Amino acid sequence: MLSLKYRIVLGLAAVVMLIDQGTKWLVEATIPFHGTVPVIHGVFDLVNIRNRGAAFGFLNRSDIEWQFWLFLVATVLAVWAILSLTRASKNEPVLYTAFGLIMGGALGNLVDRIRYRAVVDFLDFYWGEWHWPAFNVADIAICIGAFLAFVAMYRQPSPERGNKE
């Protein structure tokens, strides 16, 4: 049987991946490709777009074919690193939560990359002419996970700070 730390990481990753894929399925079933559904006029729309790049549109260019392989390898390495760090860590529930969120988000976006060679993005925030790049549930999970990992590592005692919290 898997230890509690692996159950936390893998269980949360599975939940994130299912929510991510479920929301993307709902968007694809209800919003035409490149369609827009206004939610809060002038602030927030639901959209159905594809992003071939990384988070927030980085490397989102159709003329770059190698980015699929880059993101595939990066996801495999991230999952391997998360499992290795989980094995090496001792009783760190915040860190396990962070790892589960990051892994679930990475795997959710990987499913899209395998299906479409792009990621389905649907949350679009803007103000006037300013637009934040569209994103999805997987991106949210990765960002929250990265923040929690930072918090967990910052809380670790260091030789310079001693064991004070």
UniProtKB/Swiss-Prot annotation:
Keywords tagged on the record: Aspartyl protease, Cell inner membrane, Cell membrane, Hydrolase, Membrane, Protease, Transmembrane, Transmembrane helix
Entry GO CC: plasma membrane
UniProt keyword annotation of Hydrolase present: yes
UniProt record, GO biological process: proteolysis
TM regions (residue ranges): 66-86, 91-111, 132-152
Pfam family name, one: Peptidase_A8
InterPro entries: Peptidase_A8
Pathway annotation from the record: Protein modification; lipoprotein biosynthesis (signal peptide cleavage)
Active-site feature positions: D121, D139
Membrane topology: Multi-pass membrane protein
Annotated EC: 3.4.23.36
Gene Ontology molecular function: any one: aspartic-type endopeptidase activity
The reaction(s) this protein catalyses: Release of signal peptides from bacterial membrane prolipoproteins. Hydrolyzes -Xaa-Yaa-Zaa-|-(S,diacylglyceryl)Cys-, in which Xaa is hydrophobic (preferably Leu), and Yaa (Ala or Ser) and Zaa (Gly or Ala) have small, neutral side chains
Subcellular location: Cell inner membrane
Task performed by this protein: This protein specifically catalyzes the removal of signal peptides from prolipoproteins.
Family statement: Belongs to the peptidase A8 family.
Protein name stated in the entry: Lipoprotein signal peptidase
Source organism of this protein record: Nitratidesulfovibrio vulgaris (strain ATCC 29579 / DSM 644 / CCUG 34227 / NCIMB 8303 / VKM B-1760 / Hildenborough)
Gene transcribed to yield this protein: lspA
